[in-house]
């Protein structure tokens, strides 16, 4: 083994310089000043493993659309069952819209979890609902006021977005579900009966136990009814698919 004297100190200094440079780039006098697609890997306490996020920041260039003035809003954007944290950047114009409408977009990785706590699986619900906002708020100096924070997703991600927003109504101004699985009880019954080839009954049982029955807090239809008369409930919009 070859030992390089001073190697550890050099690496440490380099990491500090990179960290300071990134934080200066992300925030100058409290305002985001770069356009960036940040991809990061970090250890999650809730997941008990390393996971990935993508984060888009609006920029100051005028090549596509002028920069929107004011404090950027924050959108947590969730992927579907067969996707991952790269889904939105690969298959949509999300970076363009982030700049046009002045959003910081945070896209986490959740595998095929349905954003559940998991009876025998991994606690993706508390990771996305609680740990991820705390980490990103600290790293990127986000304005995390309720009126500045939104969540959305498609398919499985639409279900996750609604479930998270309605279980944390104090955190989100609005939630959008694109072809989201909102009749989640009906969906789990269909999968348990073997009537959907894209998911096995065993996956549902790993979320909800042998009976495969979701609890009330995991059922968007129950949550919508529960919060119907709450004046402080998040605004909700559901887009249906064409299939």
Language model features: what each stretch is:
Residues 3-7, 13-243:
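Non-catalytic cap/lid and distal C-terminal segments of serine-dependent acyl enzymes
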């Amino acid at each position: 083994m070859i030992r390089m004297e001073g190697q550890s100190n050099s690496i440490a200094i380099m990491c500090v310089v990179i960290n300071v440079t990134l934080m200066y780039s992300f925030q100058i006098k409290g305002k985001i000043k770069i356009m960036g697609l940040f991809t990061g890997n970090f250890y999650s306490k809730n997941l008990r493993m390393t996971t990935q996020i993508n984060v888009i920041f609006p920029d100051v260039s005028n090549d596509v659309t002028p920069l929107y003035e004011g404090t950027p809003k924050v959108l947590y954007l969730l992927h579907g069952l067969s996707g991952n944290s790269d889904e939105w950047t690969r298959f949509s114009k999300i970076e363009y819209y982030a700049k046009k409408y002045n959003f910081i977009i945070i896209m986490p990785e959740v595998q095929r979890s349905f954003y559940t706590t998991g009876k025998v699986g991994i606690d993706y619900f508390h990771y996305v609902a609680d740990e991820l906002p705390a980490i990103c708020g600290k790293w990127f100096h986000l304005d995390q006021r309720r009126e500045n924070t939104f969540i959305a997703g498609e398919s499985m991600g639409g279900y996750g977005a609604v479930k998270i927003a309605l279980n944390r109504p104090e955190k989100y101004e609005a939630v959008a579900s694109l072809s989201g699985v909102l009749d989640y009880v009906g969906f789990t019954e269909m999968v348990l009966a073997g009537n959907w080839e894209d998911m096995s009954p065993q996956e549902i049982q790993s979320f909800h136990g042998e009976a495969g029955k979701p609890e009330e807090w995991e059922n968007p239809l129950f949550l919508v009814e529960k919060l119907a008369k709450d004046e402080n409930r998040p605004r909700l919009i559901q887009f249906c698919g064409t299939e």
